[in-house]
Amino acid sequence: MWGTARHKLLVLNPVSTDVWNDLTLTHVKKILSPEIEVSVRSLSEGPPAIESEYDRDLAAPHVVSEVIKASKEGFHAVVINCFDDPGLRASREVSKILVLGIGETSLAVATLLGYRIAVISTGSKYSRTAYYRRAIELGLEKRVVYASGVDIRVLDLRKDLNTVKKALLDEAKKAINEFNAEVIVLGCSGLIGLSEELSEVLGVPVVDPTLVTVGLAEAMIKLGLRHYSYKP
């Protein structure tokens, strides 16, 4: 029995703007149990959005600092809320608490839902290169059959949701019809809350990386699990 003890979870938006914090908090609270005390933060320094490897690497040291801070503040886990997982491995080296990245976690969960996986993010050119490479790093190069993105800037994703949804549907249908994708992974935290509607239209599982990772973080906290850690 898990009991009623409160566990602290931090969802870290690894960007220097707080425009995503309230939206993220609203959605994650819907799926978490009352035993989880969740907080959402962004960085005080770093890129305003992560749309390139440069942005990812620029954010990484600030992410590590926030993870160290969260550990000292008594958090039981941190979710790095960007599909590129900036600073994930370094954060695990310096922290004894659970640290999950939404990219790695959502791809792992996708393997349980279907064999042929498609990743649809923002920025088609970057996504095609970055997420095929990521699939290789995770040993999923035979599972990820399609990676692309909608050409809408991250900070513009919530300005016209109908346009965003149409673009996502077009890419997803291409992945399904031309590449036989069986599960779609949304490759950006800015697409939070759209997976259920997309799944109903497409008829295949659509993974919301933030919600899947937050839900898994709760389960892992309660089970007393955390990542293997070592200090170099």
Residue ranges and their predicted role:
Residues 2-21, 117-121:
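Short beta-strand segments enriched in small/hydrophobic residues
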Residues 19, 111-149, 219-232:
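Short, glycine-/small-residue-rich phosphate/pyrophosphate-handling segment
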Residues 41-61, 155-161:
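N-terminal beta-loop-helix "entrance" segment that forms/cooperates
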Residues 53-73, 163-171:
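Glycine-rich, highly charged phosphate/nucleotide-binding loops
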Residues 60-90, 94, 188-192:
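Beta-alpha junction/loop-to-helix N-cap segments that form part of ligand/metal-binding clefts
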Residues 80, 84-87, 169-201, 213-214:
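Hydrophobic alpha-helical
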Residues 92-113, 198-214:
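Short, acidic/small-residue loops that bind anionic groups at enzyme active sites
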Residues 123-126, 132-187:
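Active-site rim beta-loop-alpha module in soluble metabolic enzymes
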